[in-house]
Amino acid sequence: MGYLDDEVKRLQGIISNIEGRVQALESRQLGGNQKKTAEEIRMILIGPPGAGKGTQAPKIKEKFNCCHLATGDMLRSQVAKKTTLGREAKKIMDAGGLVSDDIVIGMIKEELDNNKECKGGFILDGFPRTVPQAEGLDKMLRERSQSLQHAVELKIDDQLLVSRITGRLVHPASGRSYHTTFNPPKVHMTDDITGEPLIQRSDDNAEALKKRLATYHKQTAPVVDYYRKTGIWQAIDAAQAPGQVWKSLQAIFDGDKAKAKKAGSGLLSKLTPSS
């Protein structure tokens, strides 16, 4: 048994050295001595307007130090910066057309490549809205040797949404959202973080919302089915208080950590002799 014990220790040492070299290479890949975070998130938030994506996304961003890519905001930013893709998108929008999936996916890829916040992963909000978009996103991520971890759907009854949205307040620059009744800002009509003014969107009224919800349900059902088949879809009851929704999200993330810990210890456990 002495020989076997020595051999196990020798192999464990080799594995430990390999793990150290992998971490060093990952650090160099990130550019310098920055250590790659053990926690990284790659997820999509699915949910109708008013489900709470704008409330939960900043919390996820803070937890993982990742980027929040709300496609509408990203599109406006690219147009304002006059990037190549932004100029192309503006030309299409000025002509009354819809920006192509390839352009939007190109913008997401550009953010993942160049936005330092995306080193900790990303939250996609507002995309994909169709199955071809979901397939295009998966293809782009595969080319980066990545894949989505979660497609989390915030589910809520339409009637409750109407009451939620008609009192919604938004901080345009960040996408943070508040509610006059359910989640009011600390100072009236003022963003808690920046102190900048909040707005109420012109389409946040009952009739406009019902039309938006009908469109949302028609578009989103096939996308939800797509991610359900891949095994990464999970649903959360968004009718709960925001704090409870956050606890449900944390339970999903804690499940990731448990899986990673189990996978990481798998090889060493095989080399460790049973008592």
UniProtKB/Swiss-Prot annotation:
InterPro entries: Adenyl_kin_sub (IPR006259), Adenylat/UMP-CMP_kin (IPR000850), Adenylat_kinase_CS (IPR033690), Adenylate_kinase_lid-dom (IPR007862), AK2 (IPR028587), P-loop_NTPase (IPR027417). GO terms for cellular component: cytosol; mitochondrial intermembrane space. It comes from the Eukaryota. ATP binds at G50, A51, G52, K53, G54, T55, R168, S177, Y178, Q240. Residues 70-99 are annotated as: NMP. Signal peptide: none annotated. Its EC number is 2.7.4.3. It catalyses: AMP + ATP = 2 ADP. GO terms for biological process: ADP biosynthetic process; AMP metabolic process; ATP metabolic process; DNA replication initiation; pre-replicative complex assembly. Residues 167-204 are annotated as: LID. AMP binds at T71, R76, G97, L98, V99, G126, F127, P128, R129, Q133, R201, R212. It is found in: Cytoplasm, Cytosol; Mitochondrion intermembrane space. The keyword Transferase applies. One of its GO terms (molecular function) is DNA replication origin binding. SUPFAM superfamilies: P-loop containing nucleoside triphosphate hydrolases. Keywords: ATP-binding, Cytoplasm, Kinase, Mitochondrion, Nucleotide-binding, Transferase. Monomer. Catalyzes the reversible transfer of the terminal phosphate group between ATP and AMP. Plays an important role in cellular energy homeostasis and in adenine nucleotide metabolism. Adenylate kinase activity is critical for regulation of the phosphate utilization and the AMP de novo biosynthesis pathways. Consists of three domains, a large central CORE domain and two small peripheral domains, NMPbind and LID, which undergo movements during catalysis. The LID domain closes over the site of phosphoryl transfer upon ATP binding. Assembling and dissambling the active center during each catalytic cycle provides an effective means to prevent ATP hydrolysis. This is Adenylate kinase. It comes from Chaetomium globosum (strain ATCC 6205 / CBS 148.51 / DSM 1962 / NBRC 6347 / NRRL 1970). The lineage of its organism: Eukaryota, Fungi, Dikarya, Ascomycota, Pezizomycotina.
